[in-house]
Amino acid sequence: MSDDLFSKALENPDQDLNVELPKDDVDLGLLGDGGNERKTDEPVADAERSTGLGSGSSESESDSGSDSDSDSGSSGSEDDSADQDVEGEDEGGDAIENEDEDEDPSPSGPILSKNEILEETVPELPEDYEISEKTIITPIGVLKSAFENNIIIHATMSGEKRVLKEGSIFCLEDRTLIGMLTEVFGPLQNPFYRIKLPDSKKNLFDELKVRLGEKAFIVTPDAHWIDTFELKRNKGTDASNGYDEELPEEEQEFSDDEKEALFKKMKKQQRQRKKRDNRKLANDSDNVKVKRARQPKANSLPKLVPPLGMSSNAPMQHGYKSRNARENIKRESSATSNRNGSSPVPITQHHQQQFSANNYPFPQQPNGMPYPPYSPFPQPTNFQYPPPPFGQATPAQFSNTVPYGSLPPAYNNMSPPTQQSFMPMTQSQPPLPYGVPPMNQMQNPMYIQPPPQAPPQGNGNFQQVMELHQILLQQQQQQHQYQHQHQQDPRT
């Protein structure tokens, strides 16, 4: 359409072109029928084009009609596309509104971390607080700078021993009140003190900003100090975590490897000590429970078994038996002898020394006796031996050629019944007191008296020893009588 109008204007510059512009009479109710209108407009345009081609005389009219039709068709298509765009925008707007309704409202202002402080609290003094003329003030430093309601005072007093604490009150030389201390920072030799002023004291901030460089004082009664050695205990680093805070001990880095190794070792020992203490407490509680549950009864306890050497029935080891075993054997032997009613076979001292401890119930002593030596019974000094019986020779008449304990082998091999049949004992000597040697032994100076013997404990053993002693005396008497007879009658 635009090409036809342009060509016509060039051909006929003086002719006025009547151009019909489309009217904006779009009905909102017919937005969805744009496709149908487009279909109905297409055959109408084709019909007009065919009629325009057939009528050659009315060329201008057909051209203008076709132009108007094409303009109306194009305007109709543009209206349809505009209607579709409006509909799409309406649907998109509804979707955006739904999304806004579903999402939470976005926070207003900057995003804050967990430990971040939004606004610093400003300490304020009471309104009626005044510094009188009698109040003592002490110079502390000079006004260094002022910015954003903050007054910085550079201290001229060293803080190596102590520094001011938060809450101390500052003033000027003319006792003009500045405010309360908010923060201490900088080196200890000359620390910096920061004072935060509230927004309501804007005039005071402007006045102090003009008086920078003047001396600053502290109100001595309201000054609070903290010792520096307490601050040195807290170990700090230049690093910071995600919250711009000091790192904990387990996250700190060391410039010295030895210090780092020592720190890790200390931490490991602390963990091990803690685990050991917990385990000990758990074991103690378990042991208490087990002891209470497993306490045995008195009846269920096992019987104690004596050692092998202490039992009477146990064989002797290395020739030793305990005292209890020896006493039990003595009791058993005495009970057996009392039941049988017979005395043991007489045994001479020579043969007693040959017996081993395993064959005799009593342990062998150094003197060869079957029982331990005891102190003899006390003998009276005026004791007199009874006279020998009639017909019996005195021991002085005998020749002590044969020592005691060394009898002839033939005689030693003879049993007591044979001796009694060979020489019936018609004369008997009364038994001497226990521990008194025979007559011949008392009169023989060459005889070495054996150590006195004491009866062992127990009535049965004492009786056996007495019987054995009597038998030995009888054998010795028979021997002397036999020798005396052979000397008097050599023919026999």
UniProtKB/Swiss-Prot annotation:
Residues 472-485 have a biased composition (Low complexity). GO terms for molecular function: RNA binding. Residues 60-70, 77-105, 243-259 have a biased composition (Acidic residues). Residues 334-351 have a biased composition (Polar residues). It is found in: Nucleus. Changing M423I: In strain: YJM627. Keywords: Nucleus, Phosphoprotein, Ribonucleoprotein, Ribosome biogenesis, RNA-binding, rRNA processing. GO terms for biological process: box H/ACA snoRNP assembly; pseudouridine synthesis; ribosome biogenesis; rRNA processing. Residues 35-49, 279-289, 324-333 have a biased composition (Basic and acidic residues). The keyword NAD does not apply. The keyword Transferase does not apply. Its main location: nucleus. It holds the Pfam family Gar1. The modification Phosphoserine is found at S255. Residues 1-117, 237-351, 472-492 are annotated as: Disordered. Changing P378A: In strain: YJM269, YJM270, YJM326 and YJM1129. Residues 172-230 are annotated as: RNA-binding. PANTHER family: H/ACA RIBONUCLEOPROTEIN COMPLEX NON-CORE SUBUNIT NAF1, H_ACA RIBONUCLEOPROTEIN COMPLEX NON-CORE SUBUNIT NAF1. Present with 1810 molecules/cell in log phase SD medium. During assembly of the complex, component of the small nucleolar ribonucleoprotein particles containing H/ACA-type snoRNAs (H/ACA snoRNPs) which contains CBF5, NAF1, NHP2 and NOP10 proteins. Interacts with SHQ1. Interacts directly with CBF5. Interacts with hyperphosphorylated C-terminal domain (CTD) of RNA polymerase II large subunit (RPB1). RNA-binding protein required for the maturation of box H/ACA snoRNPs complex and ribosome biogenesis. During assembly of the H/ACA snoRNPs complex, it associates with the complex and disappears during maturation of the complex and is replaced by GAR1 to yield mature H/ACA snoRNPs complex. Acts as a competitive binder for CBF5 probably required to prevent non-cognate RNAs from being loaded during transport of the particle by inducing a non-productive conformation of CBF5. Belongs to the NAF1 family. This is H/ACA ribonucleoprotein complex non-core subunit NAF1. It comes from Saccharomyces cerevisiae (strain ATCC 204508 / S288c) (Baker's yeast). The lineage of its organism: Eukaryota, Fungi, Dikarya, Ascomycota, Saccharomycotina.
